[in-house]
Amino acid sequence: MRSGSTARFVVIHRNANSLYTLIADGTYRAVSLGRNKWKSLVGPEGSLQPNCSKEGFNVVGTSRHSKARIGIIANNENDCLTCDSRIGYGTGGSHDDSNTCGNEARVSPDNGDKHIKAMGYILVQ
């Protein structure tokens, strides 16, 4: 992910025939990178709400709130239904549905409200 002049990467080890098979059917597939690793993609400005932290492929709370094809969503409440923050690729939902790659964070996130649009790079081996 490139934000500003810096590109940052994380590695997700997942066996599949293709990236398409992991995301096309819309099924949630969990990964365990952790909040800090996802936040590192956007650098020191990364911000997420303190609860939920649902991460992986096809991550969705409710359709109008935060979602990500590949990424993490977080909430200020103890559930994952109304998440107002996200980091990832193929993202959308409330506060700025046009931010499809990067970090959106509102409603008491841990590093302040953020609106970071980034360029996404996905390398598949």
Residue ranges and their predicted role:
Residues 1-125:
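Mature extracellular or lumenal effector domains of secreted proteins
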